[in-house]
Amino acid sequence: FRSCIRSNLWHNSCITFQRRLTRIDRIFSELQHALNTTAGNTPAQRDNPAADGRDLEMSPEQIDHSAGLMRINHTGEVCAQALYLGQARVAKSEETRSHLLHAAGEEADHLAWCEQRLKELDSQPSLFNPLWYLGSYAIGLGAGLKGDGWNLGFVSETERQVEAHLAEHLDSLPPEDLRSRAILQVMKADEIRHAEHAEQNGARRLPAPIPQLMALSSRIMKAVAYRI
């Protein structure tokens, strides 16, 4: 009987230890993800849409403008990685978590493409990306804790706002910048699909002033990231 008790205690201790290891592993995995995202070490799983494209000759001013726009988009993808990871961390259902992680995987492609394009334009990502990441992760956690309907609602609203600003960037890009345009067109199509999928799976409409606050924070990010 005593040996049985000892055996059960040992078994329970092992389970507790394994759970702790799992939590620790998850924390380290998320920290590694944050470092890779902000340091530009995220590989793309899909081919770069601009791989076969060639730019026309651009003036220095046009190159600077394209670089500013692509830096904004790169920072937006840094925020998307943090946001979706935070939301997935506390998602109530496995289905919602799977949707968020799948979207994050496609957004990682966007991140890698924007990073590559910035290098081609002889520019660099925003110096404030670590701060954007931390803030977005915290927002993702907060959205996720409200439940899956609000979680998916946040995805839908985020993607719709990103879709709108990508449309603006496509209009603003120099006509000669064909490679950036090819990237943004695929990104825009992906964002539309992510929003539609969230809406089909029970996304709730976010009440005011949440969408307005999201738009305000996005404007601040874009103003800073365009320059720094």
What does each of the following model-derived ranges do?
Residues T16-I228:
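Non-heme di-metal
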